[in-house]
């Protein structure tokens, strides 16, 4: 979309540039993913976020190939699911993702969950980066204690940590920790799936109306002004375009301060430290 301002990027800890706003495909059915990604690319998105666990990498890859957009203009993220122990299993899983995507490399490879033999997984991911198959590696859903453990005992510090972040779970302490250690904060679930009546919240609605924007645009702008990478999803082209149109206004310090008290400091979905969730996610396998 040529009328939109230029996309802002963030510089990861190894110098790789990543768009601050991308398109996510979580929970988009396989039979709708190719069209959704095609529409997103046509709207102007150049960063795409998928995962082996989403089971739609093949559709993402087809949309990329059919778009005609040069590969070096795209930033593609996928994720490693919890693997059986051993570095070879991680490399096998990566090769399967790469084949499904139909690419010769990905820009960012994330460890999807902080479970299992994550040391072996991380060593394998370091090898993939050294081999040029991945431009940057990172993690997802890591709390600061486990993130610090990974940083302390490995050669490469994760470039990104993708975690649940929205107005009701703002993750300010995590954000400050990651900034201190050179890890880019990335949000999943920026709209909290509409929970807690996010789209009709009086505070968010009032601020959005003052700028002539939607609540969704306001939330994305709030995250971007915190230097948080965000990957909203939609299957509607009009919403895709709307979500991109967030670079022509700025929230004041006072407006940012009005949003801060909305933080409940708790997940609206599930706690990654809950033993039941650890067991459930840790035992699931993705081919």
Predicted features along the sequence, with ranges:
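Beta/alpha (TIM)-barrel catalytic core signal, keyed to glycine-rich beta->alpha loops juxtaposed to Asp/Glu
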Residues: 9, 113-287
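CE4/NodB-like, metal-dependent polysaccharide N-deacetylase domain
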Residues: 90-111, 127-131
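Acidic-and-aromatic substrate-binding clefts and catalytic sites of carbohydrate-active enzymes
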Residues: 28-31, 50-59, 83-88, 114-119, ...
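Short, acidic/polar
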Residues: 28-40, 86-101, 120, 145-147, ...
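Structural motif
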Residues: 39, 43, 100-101, 132, ...
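A structural motif
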Residues: 45, 103-106, 134, 158
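A short, structured active-site edge motif that brings together acidic residues
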Residues: 71-84, 107-114, 141
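N-terminal binding-site loop/beta-alpha segment at the start of enzyme catalytic domains
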Residues: 1-74, 191, 285-287
């Amino acid at each position: 979309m040529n009328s939109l301002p230029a996309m802002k990027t963030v510089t990861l800890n190894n110098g790789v540039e990543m768009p601050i706003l991308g398109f996510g495909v979580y929970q988009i059915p396989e039979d709708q993913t190719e069209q959704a990604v095609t529409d997103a690319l046509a709207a102007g998105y150049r960063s795409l976020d998928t995962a082996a666990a989403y089971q739609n990498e093949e559709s993402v890859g087809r949309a990329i190939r059919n778009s005609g957009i040069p590969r070096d203009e795209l930033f593609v993220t996928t994720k490693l699911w919890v693997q059986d122990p051993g570095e070879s299993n991680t490399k096998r899983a990566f090769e399967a993702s790469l084949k499904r995507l139909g690419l010769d490399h990905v820009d960012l490879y994330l460890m999807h969950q902080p479970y299992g033999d994550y040391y072996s997984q991380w060593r394998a991911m370091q090898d993939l980066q050294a081999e040029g198959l991945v431009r940057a590696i990172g993690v997802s859903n890591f709390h600061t204690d486990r993130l610090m453990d990974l940083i302390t005992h490995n050669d490469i510090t994760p470039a990104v940590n993708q975690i649940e972040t929205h107005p009701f779970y703002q993750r300010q302490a995590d954000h400050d920790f990651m900034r201190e250690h050179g890890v880019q904060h990335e949000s999943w679930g920026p709209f909290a799936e509409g929970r807690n009546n996010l789209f009709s919240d009086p505070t968010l609605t009032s601020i959005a109306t003052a700028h002539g924007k939607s609540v969704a645009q306001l939330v994305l702008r709030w995250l971007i002004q915190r230097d948080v990478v965000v990957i909203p999803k939609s299957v509607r082209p009009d919403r895709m375009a709307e979500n991109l149109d967030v670079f022509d206004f700025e929230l004041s310090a006072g407006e940012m301060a009005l949003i801060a008290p909305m933080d409940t400091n708790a997940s609206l979905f599930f706690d990654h430290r809950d033993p039941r969730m650890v067991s459930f996610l840790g035992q699931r396998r993705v081919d």
